[in-house]
């Protein structure tokens, strides 16, 4: 691969973002860094066959989380699907390190990207309400959650976060690339898969 770069439209070197695990679908760059849309950094499905699900909708995201779709469920990938549980007092302590809103009553997703990652959420508590923008900010408030592609459920004093993936989800999924490599796909195939519209070009 010496002297090779990923080019877009033959003249621009692509900004090859990547994440640890997409969870099954990568994310549009505009929903993560709120920057200009890039054609080669749009959400793509990890599996060979795209699903007919809109992961920005919670009902479809739940179906997705209940599946093993994408990245071929690599044994080393502990973040493809995950679940985190907190007692009420634990969650209160975690959230109030960042937001001074008292006892947490609800956490609601106001906007999700194409991979189901939340990029706008509202936290409601006994002492106030805070709207948070940005998937990384949301994850940081929640004790550095694996990703913001999660659904929240609340039981009797117990909160459960069920999610997919690890990281922002933009660009190549490292776990997905490992899966494709194990299927004898070469690096050019993998790059085109995760950065649509690009070509691997030798420049020296």
What are these regions (language model features)?
Residues 1-204:
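Conserved, single-site charged/polar hotspot
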